[in-house]
Amino acid sequence: MSDLNALTIADARDALRKGEVTSVDLTQACLSAIDQADALGTFVHKTPDLALERAKAADARIAEGDAPDMCGIPVGIKDLFCTEGVPSQAASRILDGFKPEYESTVSGKLRDAGAVMLGKLNMDEFAMGSSNETSVYGNAVNPWRAGNSDAALTPGGSSGGSASAVAGDLCLAATGTDTGGSIRQPAAFTGIVGLKPTYGRCSRWGIVAFASSLDQAGPMTKTVRDAAIMGRAMMGYDAKDSTSANIDVPDFEAMLTGDIRGKIIGIPKEYRMDGMPDEIETLWADGTAMLKDAGAVIRDISLPHTKYALPAYYVIAPAEASSNLARYDGVRFGYRADMAPGDGITEMYEKTRAEGFGPEVQRRVMIGTYVLSAGFYDAYYNRARRVRALIKRDFDEVFAAGVDAILTPATPSAAFELGKEVSDPVEMYLNDVFTVTVNLAGLPGVAVPTGVDRNGLPLGLQLIGKPWEEGELLNTAYALEAAAGFVAKPARWW
């Protein structure tokens, strides 16, 4: 078999079971691809020896029979996940040198299922960003190029390294996290599938926290079937996470029939934004037609508080971040600034945090501290919480009225050039306009590649589902994927 690193999880699993390939073969193919792809800036901590050790163990387990679906599958792990004995820095200087003595629950579940970790993946610092330009390691780069241009494009963020690695066939799949769109937006920018599960489906234990009421881990894969396979392995109850849901995780793959006849798909009028590119409008209309042709019933719906989602999100998320990031003080772990003679503990805190956090993280911490301050708590934070409740109620009412899933664009544009929006925070924040509502409401959402723009760049649509019904959501995504027939791959330039 050639190009083993280009296989899907499902195809690799089947080949492993038939003895047509070994996990060591798959792992070596990925490690070779990684070594040739430094220009993509994806893997920031490579673990080849550990990967081959785990691959050999996976092969032995497969030979014994009855191995889990993920056994022997080479994957990348976002740098936000704590991985035992392997640097886990959240792409920040302030965690320089931090090697956890424990494994996050999600990466531990994958390890226990026999998945092979190839290394840690680039991301925006502390998951704060939409372009992977805030990382201490430097930019991750999209493997796609626009037309004949050789301009470097963003892979999206914050899970930009994960998206680029999967799209560039450096690994078969990767973990991501999604606080306001950080799985779905990069997936759409790179032509892959990204699933953000219901809040509470994946344990947050051992994942460096950004905004605790919004953060959720999920799979980033080449196909919807792969998302079903990997998602199931990542999900499940964890007593160490107080927000983890003790709800059974079904066999999502077994639910992929592609039959959506009679399913009601909602099209929210509020997602038609002023100035939205014609290509996005056309993509959305085409996706709607595809689902209708597959037997779904299309219904226009209203989510009236959508316009308040972005402002509410950019109050709540920074507020939680300012609280979560208060622990980084240079005392117990990570980076500590050099002290001048006479400096005390206050100076150490100030210098360490000023030098350890990048500009975007500092910006959000300051915003969060401001909105939580005594004089502004009610005016900003409490008001944003009330708006969040209204947004959730909008979705609850739509689903209660019989809608099975909601179809929207995943992003307001295709991938843009690195450096283009980094100087304008508001412009950058607008990249999350279609995705933040899902986090605020705690719902599952999935980005599916469905077309390309005039420059040949991938475009994705988002499906939003009912809470805890990832299986139904993935089946609808499976039908959309089949109808769209997206098979484009980036031309290799790296």
UniProtKB/Swiss-Prot annotation:
Record protein name field: Glutamyl-tRNA(Gln) amidotransferase subunit A
GO terms (BP aspect): translation
UniProt signal peptide: none
Protein purpose: Allows the formation of correctly charged Gln-tRNA(Gln) through the transamidation of misacylated Glu-tRNA(Gln) in organisms which lack glutaminyl-tRNA synthetase. The reaction takes place in the presence of glutamine and ATP through an activated gamma-phospho-Glu-tRNA(Gln).
Annotated PROSITE patterns: AMIDASES
PANTHER family cross-referenced by the UniProt entry: GLUTAMYL-TRNA(GLN) AMIDOTRANSFERASE SUBUNIT A, TRANSAMIDASE
Reactions that this protein is recorded to catalyse: L-glutamyl-tRNA(Gln) + L-glutamine + ATP + H2O = L-glutaminyl-tRNA(Gln) + L-glutamate + ADP + phosphate + H(+)
Record-stated family: Belongs to the amidase family. GatA subfamily.
EC annotation from Swiss-Prot or TrEMBL: 6.3.5.7
Subunit structure: Heterotrimer of A, B and C subunits.
Native source species: Jannaschia sp. (strain CCS1)
NCBIfam families, alphabetized: gatA
Broad enzyme group: ligase
Residues at the catalytic site: 78, 158, 182
One Pfam family matching this protein: Amidase
Cellular component GO terms, alphabetical: glutamyl-tRNA(Gln) amidotransferase complex
Keywords annotated in UniProt: ATP-binding, Ligase, Nucleotide-binding, Protein biosynthesis
InterPro entries, per the entry: Amidase, Amidase_CS, Amidase_dom, AS_sf, GatA
